[in-house]
Amino acid sequence: MSKTVTGPDGKCRCAWCDAAPEFNAYHDTEWGFPVIDDQRLFEKICLEGFQSGLSWRTILAKRENFRAAFADFDFRKLAKFDEKDVERLLQDAGIIRHRGKIEASINNAKRACEMVEREGSLAAYFWRFEPDPSEIAIPQTKSTSPTSVALSKDLKKRGWKFVGPTTVFAFMQAMGLINDHAEGCFLRPKIDEVRKSLVRPG
């Protein structure tokens, strides 16, 4: 069963908030709120790729550095990065200096541009993979789902990299394609209401 923790303000939150003090603000203002902005969706899927094998705390601490280094995750600008940019980024101590992940982000920016041409927007594409409610497991008991596997497979077929099913599931949790706030978390009902009123892109 997923659990909650009670913060100093008396509010019950998802238990993972207890792992680091900075997680509370991220949890309360970002995680699980539905996102239909292409740039934010692209940023998140890139950062989830960088997180692979690391902790989200590490990535969150470096997020502003990533934004500065990667053209604020404007995928149209990032798609134009070349080998000189890769070498520059490999010298940037403010980010995760992993050549494969850096090159994957640039590659994915190019794929994102192609996707917008075909689909109209990244949001229209990603929200097509919003799971049916019957598929949703008990909150925070899974690290993948049939939909995250399907989305991962489709992204890879389109040439995206560092988009395995676990990475994609974390992306879906964070971007509000599912409401994975724990039962008892003070935000779970609020997220449900936001999701009900959301006009899905497409």
Which residue ranges define each predicted feature?
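HhH-family (HhH-GPD) DNA N-glycosylase catalytic core used in base-excision repair
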Residues: M1-G202
